[in-house]
Amino acid sequence: IRLEQNYRSTQNILNAANGVIANNTERKEKTLWTENPEGEKIHFRQFMNGYEEAEFVVGDIARRHREGTAEYHNCAVLYRTNAQSRLFEEKCLLANIPYKIVGGVNFYARKEIKDLLCYLKTVDNAADDLAVRRILNVPKRGIGATTVGRIQDYADMMNISFYDALRVAEEVPSIGRSLSKVDGFVTFIQSLKSKAQAYSVSELLEEIIDLTGYVDELKAEDTEESRARVENIDELISKTVSYEETMKAENREATLSGFLEEIALIADIDSVDENQDYVVLMTL
């Protein structure tokens, strides 16, 4: 039994789909059709890279909205992998276009992205207690909640940052056998701080990924989810490279602080209200 009638698409869309699927030699013969009108013709465009693609797509949505030919909720951007959402999200934000990711999480809210950004934040400014606490056991270092609590209590008592308390962990009451693990973390962060003086942002990020074994651990899991997370990390690396290229083109210095400031502008975006007019972003 072949289910060939389509009730939602236009015939032009189905004709294009038929043309693409026809090249699959292992498929069973099937031709999709509809009683709907032919609809608008499909426009096919190729771009040199993802940046040009996202800029054109979002620019086209903005133009249609500006001209009154489409509302935001009439528009959707479909892509193959979650990692591709980052460019479309950023372009939408720059164009002040509301959007909603369907069936996924905003790029900068994904666990692996937040973990690695917190490493960069800690290297840049170890007084960021939230960032330091997030990565203290990423990867797992065997520093338990009780130890973390004692260190935080000491930091509060001495009115110092959590990281400064880590640096003098030997003075924390009842720190016990966790001291060597805490010292190992501090030594690691201090080495990254030293390297940050000579490394570019992208080099520093790749060094963190390499030394923590973050991607190696994900690859060892070898699941669909872990592979998607590796793609997200690759996309974050691409973002650092893009930032450096932009700064170079503008004859400005690419700094870790500058990169984190740029990310901060787009990372803390509240979710779109369900009743608002927004563009839909989603994977196929």
Predicted ranges, named:
Residues 14, 112-115:
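Short secondary-structure transition/capping segments
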Residues 96-106:
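Conserved RecA-like helicase motor-core motifs
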Residues 71, 85-97, 110, 117-284:
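Conserved helicase C-terminal RecA-like lobe
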Residues 1-6, 165-167:
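Conserved phosphoryl-transfer catalytic core
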Residues 3, 7, 106, 140-141:
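Phosphate/pyrophosphate-binding and catalytic-coupling "lid/hinge/switch" segments at subdomain interfaces
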Residues 78-80, 102, 282-284:
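Generic beta-strand/beta-sheet core signal
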Residues 5-98, 121-125, 157, 179, ...:
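Helicase P-loop NTPase motor core
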